[in-house]
Each structure stands twice: as structure tokens, then as C-alpha cells.
Amino acid sequence: MEMNLLQKLCVVCSKCNEYAMELECLKYCDPNVLLAESTPFKRNAAAIVYLYRKIYPEVVAQNRTQSSLLTLYLEMLLKALHEDTALLDRALMAYSRQPDRAAFYRTVLRLDRCDRHHTVELQFTDNVRFSVSLATLNDIERFLCKMNYVYGILAPEAGLEVCAQLLELLRRLCGISPVARQEVYVEGTTCAQCYEELTIIPNQGRSLNKRLQGLLCNHIAVHRPSSQSDVNIQTVEQDLLDLTTRIPHLAGVLSALKSLFSSSSAYHSYIQEAEEALREYNLFTDIPERIYSLSDFTYWSRTSEVIVKRVGITIQQLNVYHQLCRALMNGISRHLYGEDVEDIFVLGEKALDGEERMFVGSVFAAPNRIIDLITSLSIQAFEDNPVFNKLHESNEMYTKIKHILEEIRRPLPDGTGGDGPEGEVIHLRGREAMSGTGTTLMTASNSSNSSTHSQRNNGGGGRARGGGKKAVGGGANGQDGDGSENGLRVRNCDEHEALDLVDARSRIHNVTREVNVRKRAYLQKVSEVGYGKVIRCIKTQERLTSKLIDVNLVGPLCLDFISKLMNGFLYRSQYHQDQDVVDVGNQFTYDEHLYVVNNLIHKSLPVESLPLLGQQIYELCNGPLFTHCTDRYPLSHNVDMAYACDNAGVLPHVKDDLVKCAEGTVYPSEWMVVKYMGFFNFSDCQDLNVLQKEMWMHVRELVLSVALYNETFGKQLSIACLRDELHPDRDVILTYNKEWPLLLRHEGSLYKSKDLYLLLYRHLSRPDESGDVPTAPVAKPSTLTAAAAVSGAFREPDRPWLPSPYPSSSTAGVSRRVRATRKRPRRASSLLDLARDEHGIQDLVPGSLR
């Protein structure tokens, strides 16, 4: 099956990406090795030159007609590959003449100049223009959102020029590598996609701006965790099978690499021991009470995530791994080229200190290893702090699981006695009671706990429960009643004897005891909260470190936004030079404009139609980036407009002005603000905010006037905008252009005008059989009525034209009287119905036109 053009472009793009990754790696290699192995590079360079000459001009032409994310990326990639290939070739030629590794790397990496800054000039009118400085991918994304907000007041030629500049800046920032450089993006700055993701999840009472703070963006630069090098060491061993037989010491280096990370840490090994103990029990086995408690505590230790898992890597292991890989590489290099490798990483190690080298990482170790090392060092720093140790020891889950495991390891002679898990826990609590906690409270707590477990478990633990209760000396069952009564009597006697020796007020309230209880409760609460905060801090910093150090690919968001904006500007300019578009300004004059306005100015819109018309105003005021109204499950137009305003950073009072404009009004005298032939002419505006409000009012007049026109004349005109492709089923099209802001599709023809009401007059009137377009005579309303009645120039759309049976002079001598109050059923309205004199008799209307 033959591939189509899109599939062929995808294949070309895939091969170019493959070569781009290889070329990016060659920039960091030893130039001596490159000169020795230059044949594949020259062959690929010749292929890139051919593709650049053959495909690049066609891709550029395609993007100036209709762009897509693929064609824009291919245009950017082909030009970058052509430039970088030529640059590397020149650097290799210069190195062959004068070997200087530092000069070679400065040339291929462009270290002597900085071209990653650009200033964009935006001109809206002769008096409104701005300069915006861009330096990162986040700046480009935010600037594109602002361009979307001012899409309607930006000329298409200026918009296309700005998009071309942004594409050039993207090429300079990203280069040929799919891996984003750390200096071209800011990980803590959110984007439009982050905003949209947060709008569809529960906010839990927090505002959107507050939730965006501290969020790591994964759309401008997409995080891709890299694989661990120790996992791939087997692949390396398979690749070096031929060299292992010829280089004896390689086998020892490979075996040392494989065994380096085999040892695992025993930190918190009781968790694994608990899981091993739980595997012996299932649904059909007797479950002792201690096993149920162990399962319960293990579950809570997992879900609450209060146990720190130590990362099994040390800085010594990483250093040894780096040295072993360096020895492996140099051994292969000496065998193949007769000298050690001296690439940019070897040169860089000499210029970095210990901490900088740790964050830069190793060329042999995956970034995940560096992240694990930093996390391990952070946890170790906390562990060295006595406060953290106290918090860790106060962890209730840790204590319970540890002592239950100790109880399981301890042999029981007959399954009874005080060595069960309850007895152990109560024994520990008894020791705590000696420092201020009452034994009575602990005994009551244990009896409640034991009764709860006895209700849940029916097998294997009854005797242990009974023995535990007897050991304590108090229980809930009748068997232990005597012991409980005796213990209570002894305690009461001791308390009475002790209270007789002190002040009588102590019988009412034991202040010292209450202080101790409250102090321990407060310390326990502080310990739990503090420990949780420490764990959350470590996890947050680990995510941030992963974003900083791990691999981040350039996301498609910026190119997607540029493609949508370019297509919008291209659609707006495609009818500029079309000779088939008729300008109605050459056919009609101010009289026709005034005719339509006078027939609409005294009418009013139904109040119930304003919400739907407001949605149409939002649709026409919005740009092409946020169009969720076309999704499978569409959102309303005001939601799209809210997304556009929030991502552009519009101030709240400006949003309020937009909402008031979109709410509309039913009276035409309040929305008819555009002068004759002045639609979308903002040359008098001196400020961007004023310019934007004027644009909103022009859009409001378009929507409400067309709606009133449909209501008055019985028409069904629909409105579209040139934000995407031209709608063949719409009648009035808003182009946002100053020269021809409005188009009318009518009877197979396309008309343009700078005045809305001339287009409405064009739609209302139709050419007669001779092909002459009628014009409204300059006369009084009564004369215009008579002329329209006689001439028959206007007719209803679905009724054939018939000559009038009445002579033209018959209307002159008819006396004026009040029209009868009887109303006819509304039919398709004609100009004659509107132009009829209010006080004229109904017999004036010819029968053929009634």
C-alpha cells in the first residue's frame, strides 16, 4: 500500500530526528575520534543537504498556505540541521589544521555568542505599538496567549510576521536536540495547559491562582525519566562481546560494574519482614490476633506514607561506577585509536568542584542516580538532626510494627500468657504510665481495643486474648470479674490513703497529673505534624530535583499555538486579492445605510434572546487558541473566553468591562455606535485598552444588529468569523480586517464592505430581471413608500415577482387615515411592509404583494 504525503513527511521527520540526536551527541565527543570516524558523518551530511534543498522550500510554502504542527517542526528542524552540520564540518576542518579542543567546543556549542534573546514589535495602529522581550520557551507561550487575546485587532500581515519571528526564536532556543536545555525554560512557571488541567479537577476550596503557585509545568518541557545504567549494563556487555576476547581486562571491569549496585539497603527492613509473615495467611486459614494487628498496621504504614524509604545509593558507589566506566571507555579507545578519550566531560571535570559536579552529574550515570543520591544526602542530613530522630522514633506505626514483629519472633510455650501482642503493647504503655500517664487509662484503652479485635476475628487468637487480659488484671468478661474488683478496691484504698496526707483541694483536681497528660498529648501532636511536614518537604524537593536534573524534552505546546495563530491569520488574508469579491460600497450609498438603520432603530430585541447572543459575542471576541466549543463534549463560549483572558493575564476590571459588553441591551440606540463605513476602524484610539473595548463594541453591534434584522425582516442570517476555515453555511463573516472587515455570502456571490448596514441592504434587496441593482431614492418616507409600491423592485424571497395592477398615480389622492387594528398573520416580511406609511390605508398595498 502506497503511503500518502502526510505519512511520507512523518517518515522524513523521524529520520531527521534520528540524525539530529546523533549530531547533537557528536558535538560533545573527542574531535580526534570524530576525524577518525568521519565517513558516516559526511554521508549523513550529504543527505541533509539534499533534503534541505529539496524539501525545505516546499515546507515553507506549505506553512505560508496552511500550517500544521508537523510541517512547522520540520521547517525548523531542517534549517537547524543544515546550519549545525555545516558548523560541525567547519569546526572539524579547523581542528585538523590546528588541534585545539577548547576552540573546537566553543565553536560547535556556540559559546562565544548568545542569540537566545529576541524583541518582538507589535503594532496595532499608528499610535498603539509595543515591544516585548522574549528569552525562554515560557515567554513564547505566554506571549502567544496574549496574541490570542488581541487577535481581532492585530492585522494578519503583522501577525504572520510575528509568528515567523517566534518560529525563528524557537529554532535558536531548541536547536536540533529534542532535549530541552535547562536555560531555555523555567520549570516553576505554569502554562495554559496547566491552567486547563486544574480547571477540571476539584479545587477543595482553593483559588486557581493559589493552586498554580509552586506547580511544576510538564508541558513546555516534558519530563521523561531515563533508564538506569546498571540495568542496561547487560546490553553493554553483549555489545562488547567481540572486544572482550581481544581486550583481557574488560571482563573484570564489566563484572565489577554488574556487582556494584547489587547490594540493597536494609533500612526499615521490618516492612519486608512483615510482608513475608503475612504471606503465610489467606482467607481459609486461622488468623491469630497478632497477625491481624500486623496487617492493619502495615496497611496504614503504606497509605499514610510516613515511613522514609532510604535510597540505596551512596556517593562512594557513584564515584566507583564513574571510574569503572571511564576505565572501560579508555581501554576501548586505546585499543581502537591508541590514546585515551578527552572529550568535553573530561575537560569539564577539572573546572568543577564537588557540589557542582554532583548536580551536573556523570556522563555514564543516569540522572535518576544523581537524584537518588541528592535525596539520600537530604534524608541523611535530617537523620543527623536530633529533632528528626525524635520525630522518627515517635512514629506510632513504626513502633507498633516493630514490637509486633518482636512478639512473633518470641516463642510461646502454649499460646497463652502475657506475651501476646496486647500484653506487649500494654507492658510498654505501663512503662509510659510511670512517667506521667495513668495505668487506668491504658487498661481501659486496651480492653476496648481487645474487644474490637475479638469482634473482627473468630479464630486462632482467643486464648491469647484471654491470657493477655488476665495478665493486666482487668477485663470485660465475667471470668475476670473477681480480679477486676480486687484491683479496683486496692487502687481505691491507695488513693484514699494518699489524699488524706495532702490538701483537701487536691481531691477535686490533680493539677500535676493533668499538666503531664496535656504535655504528652501536645508533644505527640507536634511530633506527628512535624514528621509529616518533613516527609512532605523531602518529597516536594525530590520532585523539583527530578525536574531540574532529569531529561526534559521540548514539548509541542508552543508549536501548536503558533500553528493555530498562523492559520487564523492566513484565513483572514486569503480573500484580500480575490477579484470575485464584490464591494457593495461601489453600489450603495449612505441612503441605503440610513434606510436599514431607520428601520431598526425603533425596534427592540426580545430580552430572552440576550444570553444566547452574549455567547455569540464571546465567540467572536475570542482568538483561535481556546476553542473547546468544538470538542466532543463542548464547553460554552464564555468558558473559552475566560481561558483566553486568564492565560493572557487580563486584569479583573477589564474582564468586568467585557462581561458588561457581552450582556448587551435590547435597545438599538445603545449599541449602534459605529459610524458610516467605519466598521473595525480604530485609527483614533490612543490606548490598547480603549482599542480592545472599541473592538468589543463593534462585535456587539454586529451580533445584535443582525439578530434584530432577522427578527424584523424574518430572515435567518448567521455569523461566523475567520478564526478557522471559511464556513460555507454561514452568511455574514467577520474577517477582523480594517480594509474589508465584513463578508456576505448571498446567492452564490461574495460581497465585502466596511459598513454592516450596506451588507444587510444587499441581503434584503435582490436584482431584478434586467440585472440592475435598485438604489433607494432620496425622498420622504411617503414618497419612498409609493415608489417602492409601484416599482416592484423588492419582493419576498419565495414569491415570484408580479407587476402591480394599480397605476402609479392611484396612490396620490388617497386620504390618510388610521390603519385598522386587525393584525394579519406574520409572513416573510418585505421592504414594502416596513416602508408602508403608518397612517395609510391597507388598500394601498396591491393584492399581489399582500
UniProtKB/Swiss-Prot annotation:
GO molecular function, one term: ATP binding
Subunit structure: Associates with TRM2 and TRM3 to form the tripartite terminase complex. Interacts with portal protein.
Residue ranges, compositional bias (Low complexity): 439-457
Keyword tags: ATP-binding, Host nucleus, Late protein, Metal-binding, Nucleotide-binding, Viral genome packaging, Viral release from host cell, Zinc, Zinc-finger
InterPro entries (alphabetical): UL28/UL56
Disulfide bonds: none
Entry binding sites for ATP: Y709, N710, E711, T712, F713, G714, K715, Q716
Family: Belongs to the herpesviridae TRM1 protein family.
Protein name (database record): Tripartite terminase subunit 1
Known role: Component of the molecular motor that translocates viral genomic DNA in empty capsid during DNA packaging. Forms a tripartite terminase complex together with TRM2 and TRM3 in the host cytoplasm. Once the complex reaches the host nucleus, it interacts with the capsid portal vertex. This portal forms a ring in which genomic DNA is translocated into the capsid. TRM1 carries an endonuclease activity that plays an important role for the cleavage of concatemeric viral DNA into unit length genomes.
Biased amino acid composition, Basic residues: 816-827
